[in-house]
């Protein structure tokens, strides 16, 4: 077993502590950080969906991308690159988001929910691990999304430019941007604090390569536990923080922005895990890669935002009352699509 990478552990502890802090300062319960939820809220703010309770441009998303950009520039790792099956990445990003909104959270929120005592998230974790395991089977068989190409700094700057525009819109708050007055979208930490925390998390995630999928994938495939320690560190930090603030609530019932349908919690996260393995990283990792110049990750993030819009425009997203019929059908379709991509992209020479 390789040595512990203390930078990954430190990054995990900071992410967990940041999640607790942001919740204490106004973010929804067990949602200090959630890439899926925050991209959904941002999509709503831009008018891509009309669910009035989940519309807000989340500064944390802006901060993560810009923090990654700053770190990548500082260590000369910013590089415009892309062209690796962009259309497939867009579609996979869309279905990863559909799976996440079936569960009501990305892998990072799953960890934060576990740290808050939400046992439904343990069920989600089981599905997540199974999905990652299925993905690794295809990696071992030679799955590939084809090579990426050097595309230049301008192409790599697209996502940073998008989030700068989002920051301007957040601060200016023009009338065509939608902001929730009730529900999860109306609950948020102060803009400056959320932005600064996002910058720190983005920079640390870029330097440490923290990835909620990568930790489990590497442990399964290579017996390499470095990234997995970061995964565990997030949960430990959230547990400690919630115990200190009195927000630890062990159980299945009455958890914030969660439902108790175990089967669909597991299936939603299985779809997230499988799709994320094919994409090369979890939603957090995709934001970080987009910040350091990956056009492929930018396409993936845009796919996730469209996926969020589809979820709320067509009734695919779950609620505290449980999953919807439309959402169940969409997740099943997602498994079919991910399976087709997995089988078709196994290298012929493998």
What are these regions, as identified by a protein language model?
Residues 1-350:
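Membrane-interfacial helix-loop segments of redox and metal-homeostasis proteins
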């Amino acid at each position: 077993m390789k040595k512990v990478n203390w930078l990954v552990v430190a990054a995990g502890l900071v992410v967990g502590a940041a999640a607790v802090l942001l919740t204490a300062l106004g973010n929804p319960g067990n949602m200090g950080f959630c890439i899926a939820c925050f991209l959904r809220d941002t999509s709503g703010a831009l008018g891509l969906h009309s669910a009035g309770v989940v519309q807000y441009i989340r500064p944390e998303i802006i901060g993560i991308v810009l923090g990654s950009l700053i770190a990548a520039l500082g260590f000369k790792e910013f590089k415009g690159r892309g062209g690796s099956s962009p259309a497939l990445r867009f579609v996979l990003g869309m279905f990863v988001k559909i799976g996440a909104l079936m569960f009501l959270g990305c892998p990072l929120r799953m960890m934060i929910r576990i740290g808050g005592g939400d046992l439904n998230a343990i069920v989600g974790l089981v599905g997540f691990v199974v999905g990652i395991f299925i993905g690794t089977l295809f990696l071992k068989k030679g799955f590939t999304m084809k090579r990426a190409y050097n595309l230049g700094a301008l192409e790599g700057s697209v996502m940073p430019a998008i989030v700068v525009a989002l920051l301007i819109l957040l601060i200016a708050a023009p009338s065509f941007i939608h902001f929730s007055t009730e529900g999860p979208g109306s609950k948020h930490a102060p803009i400056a604090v959320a932005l600064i925390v996002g910058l720190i998390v983005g920079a640390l995630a870029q330097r440490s390569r923290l990835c909620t999928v990568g930790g489990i994938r590497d442990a399964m495939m290579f017996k390499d536990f470095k990234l997995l320690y970061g995964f565990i560190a997030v949960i430990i930090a959230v547990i400690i923080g919630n115990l200190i603030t009195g927000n630890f609530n062990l159980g299945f019932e009455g958890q914030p922005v969660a439902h108790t349908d175990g089967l669909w919690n597991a299936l939603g996260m299985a779809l997230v895990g499988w799709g994320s393995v094919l994409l090369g990283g979890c939603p957090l990792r995709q934001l970080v890669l987009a910040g350091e110049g990956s056009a492929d990750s930018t396409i993936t993030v845009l796919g996730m935002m469209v996926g969020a819009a589809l979820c709320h425009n067509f009734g695919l997203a779950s609620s505290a009352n449980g999953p919807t019929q439309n959402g169940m059908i969409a997740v099943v379709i997602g498994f079919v699509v991910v399976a087709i991509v997995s089988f078709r992209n196994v290298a012929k020479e493998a």
